[in-house]
Protein backbone atom coordinates (compact mmCIF):
# COMPACT_ATOMS: atom_id res chain seq x y z
CA UNK A 1 0.00 0.00 0.00
CA UNK A 2 2.85 2.38 0.77
CA UNK A 3 4.41 1.79 -2.64
CA UNK A 4 1.04 2.30 -4.32
CA UNK A 5 0.50 5.51 -2.35
CA UNK A 6 3.96 6.74 -3.33
CA UNK A 7 3.20 6.20 -7.01
CA UNK A 8 -0.24 7.80 -6.86
CA UNK A 9 0.92 10.74 -4.73
CA UNK A 10 3.82 11.33 -7.15
CA UNK A 11 1.42 11.44 -10.09
CA UNK A 12 -1.54 13.24 -8.53
CA UNK A 13 -0.34 14.87 -5.31
CA UNK A 14 -1.75 14.31 -1.84
CA UNK A 15 -5.24 15.19 -3.04
CA UNK A 16 -5.33 11.84 -4.85
CA UNK A 17 -8.37 9.72 -3.84
CA UNK A 18 -7.86 6.77 -1.52
CA UNK A 19 -9.83 4.43 -3.85
CA UNK A 20 -7.19 5.05 -6.54
CA UNK A 21 -4.45 3.99 -4.12
CA UNK A 22 -6.45 0.94 -3.07
CA UNK A 23 -6.99 -0.07 -6.70
CA UNK A 24 -3.28 0.12 -7.50
CA UNK A 25 -2.42 -1.80 -4.32
CA UNK A 26 -4.97 -4.49 -5.17
CA UNK A 27 -6.96 -4.06 -1.97
CA UNK A 28 -10.26 -2.53 -0.94
CA UNK A 29 -10.34 1.04 0.32
CA UNK A 30 -11.48 -0.30 3.70
CA UNK A 31 -8.16 -2.13 4.01
CA UNK A 32 -6.31 1.12 3.38
CA UNK A 33 -8.34 2.92 6.05
CA UNK A 34 -7.83 0.12 8.57
CA UNK A 35 -4.07 0.47 8.21
CA UNK A 36 -3.99 4.25 7.75
CA UNK A 37 -7.00 5.95 9.39
CA UNK A 38 -6.30 9.29 7.68
CA UNK A 39 -4.44 10.46 4.62
CA UNK A 40 -1.92 12.09 6.97
CA UNK A 41 -1.08 8.65 8.41
CA UNK A 42 -0.52 7.38 4.88
CA UNK A 43 1.58 10.44 4.01
CA UNK A 44 3.72 9.81 7.11
CA UNK A 45 4.29 6.21 6.06
CA UNK A 46 5.31 7.36 2.56
CA UNK A 47 7.66 10.01 3.97
CA UNK A 48 9.30 7.54 6.37
CA UNK A 49 9.78 4.90 3.67
CA UNK A 50 11.30 7.39 1.23
CA UNK A 51 13.56 9.01 3.82
CA UNK A 52 14.84 5.59 4.85
CA UNK A 53 15.56 4.91 1.19
CA UNK A 54 17.47 8.20 1.05
CA UNK A 55 19.49 7.17 4.07
CA UNK A 56 20.49 3.92 2.36
CA UNK A 57 21.38 5.75 -0.84
CA UNK A 58 23.62 8.19 1.01
CA UNK A 59 25.28 5.29 2.82
CA UNK A 60 26.11 3.80 -0.58
CA UNK A 61 27.71 7.10 -1.67
CA UNK A 62 29.80 7.26 1.50
CA UNK A 63 30.85 3.63 1.12
CA UNK A 64 32.63 4.47 -2.14
CA UNK A 65 35.29 6.29 -0.06
CA UNK A 66 36.38 8.74 -2.75
CA UNK A 67 37.92 12.16 -2.08
CA UNK A 68 35.84 14.69 -0.07
CA UNK A 69 34.78 16.83 -3.04
CA UNK A 70 33.74 13.79 -5.07
CA UNK A 71 31.83 12.44 -2.08
CA UNK A 72 29.93 15.71 -1.69
CA UNK A 73 29.27 15.83 -5.43
CA UNK A 74 28.03 12.24 -5.39
CA UNK A 75 25.71 13.00 -2.49
CA UNK A 76 24.45 16.19 -4.12
CA UNK A 77 23.71 14.47 -7.43
CA UNK A 78 22.19 11.35 -5.84
CA UNK A 79 19.75 13.31 -3.71
CA UNK A 80 18.82 15.76 -6.49
CA UNK A 81 18.25 12.85 -8.86
CA UNK A 82 16.02 11.05 -6.41
CA UNK A 83 14.02 14.10 -5.37
CA UNK A 84 13.53 15.37 -8.92
CA UNK A 85 11.81 12.10 -9.81
CA UNK A 86 9.82 11.90 -6.58
CA UNK A 87 7.03 14.46 -6.22
CA UNK A 88 5.52 12.39 -3.41
CA UNK A 89 8.30 12.81 -0.88
CA UNK A 90 8.43 16.58 -0.67
CA UNK A 91 4.68 16.94 -0.39
CA UNK A 92 4.39 14.10 2.13
CA UNK A 93 7.12 15.58 4.32
CA UNK A 94 5.40 18.98 4.14
CA UNK A 95 2.18 17.48 5.50
CA UNK A 96 3.78 15.48 8.34
CA UNK A 97 6.76 17.72 9.12
CA UNK A 98 6.17 17.45 12.89
CA UNK A 99 5.91 13.65 12.97
CA UNK A 100 8.55 12.41 15.50
CA UNK A 101 9.79 9.60 13.26
CA UNK A 102 10.05 11.90 10.26
CA UNK A 103 11.95 14.45 12.35
CA UNK A 104 14.33 11.76 13.63
CA UNK A 105 15.07 10.60 10.09
CA UNK A 106 15.61 14.16 8.91
CA UNK A 107 18.08 14.73 11.73
CA UNK A 108 19.99 11.56 10.85
CA UNK A 109 20.18 12.68 7.24
CA UNK A 110 21.31 16.13 8.37
CA UNK A 111 24.14 14.55 10.36
CA UNK A 112 25.30 12.66 7.26
CA UNK A 113 25.26 15.86 5.20
CA UNK A 114 27.08 17.77 7.94
CA UNK A 115 29.86 15.18 8.07
CA UNK A 116 30.38 15.30 4.30
CA UNK A 117 30.42 19.12 4.32
CA UNK A 118 32.94 19.23 7.18
CA UNK A 119 35.26 16.82 5.38
CA UNK A 120 35.10 18.85 2.16
CA UNK A 121 35.74 22.11 4.03
CA UNK A 122 38.65 20.61 5.96
CA UNK A 123 40.16 19.52 2.63
CA UNK A 124 39.73 23.06 1.28
CA UNK A 125 37.74 21.92 -1.75
CA UNK A 126 34.55 23.90 -1.03
CA UNK A 127 33.91 27.33 0.42
CA UNK A 128 34.19 27.79 4.17
CA UNK A 129 31.17 30.07 4.63
CA UNK A 130 28.45 27.50 3.96
CA UNK A 131 26.60 25.30 6.42
CA UNK A 132 24.90 21.92 5.94
CA UNK A 133 21.54 23.73 5.92
CA UNK A 134 22.68 25.61 2.81
CA UNK A 135 23.29 22.31 1.01
CA UNK A 136 19.84 21.05 2.00
CA UNK A 137 18.12 24.22 0.77
CA UNK A 138 20.06 24.16 -2.52
CA UNK A 139 19.21 20.53 -3.24
CA UNK A 140 15.55 21.08 -2.34
CA UNK A 141 15.44 24.15 -4.58
CA UNK A 142 16.80 22.25 -7.57
CA UNK A 143 14.79 19.10 -7.01
CA UNK A 144 11.40 20.61 -6.22
CA UNK A 145 11.43 22.86 -9.27
CA UNK A 146 12.07 20.03 -11.71
CA UNK A 147 9.22 17.46 -11.55
CA UNK A 148 6.94 19.59 -13.79
CA UNK A 149 9.76 19.76 -16.36
CA UNK A 150 10.29 16.01 -16.08
CA UNK A 151 6.65 15.44 -16.97
CA UNK A 152 7.02 17.99 -19.78
CA UNK A 153 9.52 15.83 -21.63
CA UNK A 154 12.81 17.03 -20.10
CA UNK A 155 13.61 14.23 -17.63
CA UNK A 156 17.37 14.84 -17.43
CA UNK A 157 17.34 18.56 -16.60
CA UNK A 158 17.87 17.79 -12.91
CA UNK A 159 21.53 16.89 -13.60
CA UNK A 160 22.30 20.15 -15.38
CA UNK A 161 20.90 22.29 -12.58
CA UNK A 162 22.26 20.11 -9.79
CA UNK A 163 25.77 20.48 -11.21
CA UNK A 164 25.34 24.23 -11.73
CA UNK A 165 24.31 24.53 -8.08
CA UNK A 166 27.17 22.28 -6.95
CA UNK A 167 29.73 24.44 -8.78
CA UNK A 168 28.62 27.42 -6.68
CA UNK A 169 30.28 25.69 -3.71
CA UNK A 170 33.78 26.27 -5.10
CA UNK A 171 36.09 27.95 -2.57
CA UNK A 172 36.63 31.05 -4.77
CA UNK A 173 32.97 32.13 -4.67
CA UNK A 174 31.69 35.58 -3.70
CA UNK A 175 31.21 36.44 -0.03
CA UNK A 176 27.78 35.50 1.30
CA UNK A 177 25.38 37.19 3.74
CA UNK A 178 24.38 35.24 6.83
CA UNK A 179 22.24 32.13 6.40
CA UNK A 180 20.52 29.72 8.79
CA UNK A 181 22.41 29.13 12.02
CA UNK A 182 21.73 25.39 11.88
CA UNK A 183 19.36 22.77 10.51
CA UNK A 184 16.86 23.23 13.35
CA UNK A 185 16.48 26.90 12.45
CA UNK A 186 16.05 25.93 8.79
CA UNK A 187 13.35 23.37 9.61
CA UNK A 188 11.50 25.90 11.77
CA UNK A 189 11.55 28.41 8.89
CA UNK A 190 10.28 25.79 6.46
CA UNK A 191 7.47 24.72 8.81
CA UNK A 192 6.44 28.36 9.22
CA UNK A 193 6.40 28.81 5.44
CA UNK A 194 4.28 25.67 5.03
CA UNK A 195 1.72 26.90 7.56
CA UNK A 196 1.48 30.23 5.75
CA UNK A 197 0.91 28.44 2.44
CA UNK A 198 -1.85 26.34 3.99
CA UNK A 199 -3.56 29.43 5.43
CA UNK A 200 -3.44 31.14 2.06
CA UNK A 201 -4.75 28.04 0.33
CA UNK A 202 -1.58 27.63 -1.72
Question: Where are these predicted regions, by residue range?
Answer:
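Generic hydrophobic, amphipathic alpha-helix propensity
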Residues: 1-5, 21, 46-50, 54, ...
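Helix-turn-helix
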Residues: 4, 11-41, 45
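A short secondary-structure junction motif
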Residues: 8, 12, 54, 82-90, ...
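Amphipathic alpha-helical interaction segments
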Residues: 20, 70-78, 134-138, 156, ...
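Hydrophobic alpha-helical connector segments
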Residues: 45, 52, 56-85, 97-101, ...
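Amphipathic alpha-helical packing segments from all-alpha helical-bundle domains
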Residues: 49, 97-143, 147-148, 156-160
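Short linear capping/connector segments at secondary-structure termini
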Residues: 91-100, 179-182
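C-terminal peripheral helix-coil segments that are non-catalytic and often amphipathic
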Residues: 114-122, 148, 152-202
Amino acid sequence: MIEAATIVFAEQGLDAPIPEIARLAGVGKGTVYRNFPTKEHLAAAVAIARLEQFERRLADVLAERVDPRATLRGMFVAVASHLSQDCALGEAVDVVADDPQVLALQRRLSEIVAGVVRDAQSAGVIRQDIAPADITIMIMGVARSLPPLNHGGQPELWERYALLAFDSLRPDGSALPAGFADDDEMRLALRTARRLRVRRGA
